[in-house]
């Protein structure tokens, strides 16, 4: 079965299901569909190079206990998706299944809103806000599907728009500390914060490095946060 959850967002599914003990359920998540109506993960797994068949992406598995209606919410993960493909290794009917989307993002209060007489502009605004929240998980990320990394240029380019709409000052203040932690003895900072050091800092260049100056300056400009400026000054100097 393929379920359309109605909106492309970030979070996890909440599955209610009943079936025979030992039945293995697999949930695969995607942002797109193929022409035949099946899910399309090609925009997500294009760079995936698995070393074994269990290295899968955007996928959850659950084995039924066979004790009436069971509830499964995947722990320790989140996905970006609109569509969910449900498969099982034993017969099920759609009447046995209930799926919900539990949307997730950092807890930030709304502080701004926009509405006008042009519905197209209103829709674009809502899409942008949804995309912003879908990429706010303790740090601003590049996507909720594949890398989920704190790419520094991606993050600061949407910072102003985000702060006009949400009180995300704590997210950015924490992110600046992550940037400081990536700095090397020669002053270089990584293009991703926090970083696993998969790439060294020499490739990033000024567009990514600029985040260590721009993010705290926006925090000061829009919230008066002088403490983050004090913390980052030795690294930025």
What are these regions (language model features)?
Residues 5, 74, 148, 162-165, ...:
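Short, charged/polar micro-motifs that form catalytic or ligand-binding hotspots
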């Amino acid at each position: 079965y393929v379920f359309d959850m109605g909106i492309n967002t970030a979070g996890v599914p909440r599955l209610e299901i009943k079936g025979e003990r030992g039945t293995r359920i697999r949930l695969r998540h995607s942002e797109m569909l193929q022409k035949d109506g099946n899910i399309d993960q090609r925009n997500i797994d294009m760079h995936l190079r698995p070393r074994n068949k269990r290295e899968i992406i955007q996928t959850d598995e659950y084995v039924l206990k066979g004790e009436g209606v069971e509830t499964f919410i995947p722990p320790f993960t989140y996905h970006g998706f609109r569509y969910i493909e449900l498969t099982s290794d034993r017969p099920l009917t759609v009447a046995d299944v209930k799926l919900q989307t539990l949307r997730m993002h950092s807890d930030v209060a709304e502080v701004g809103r926009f509405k006008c007489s042009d519905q197209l502009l209103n829709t674009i605004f809502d899409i942008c806000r949804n995309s912003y929240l879908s990429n706010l998980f303790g740090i601003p990320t590049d996507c909720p599907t594949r890398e989920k990394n704190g790419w520094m240029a991606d993050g600061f380019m949407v910072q102003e728009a985000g702060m006009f709409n949400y009180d995300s000052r704590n997210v950015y203040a924490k992110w600046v500390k992550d940037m400081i932690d990536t700095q090397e003895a020669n002053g270089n900072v990584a293009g991703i914060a926090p970083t696993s050091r998969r790439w060294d800092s020499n490739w990033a260049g000024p567009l990514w490095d600029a985040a260590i100056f721009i993010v705290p300056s926006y925090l000061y400009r829009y919230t008066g946060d002088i403490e983050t400026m004090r913390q980052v000054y030795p690294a930025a100097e």
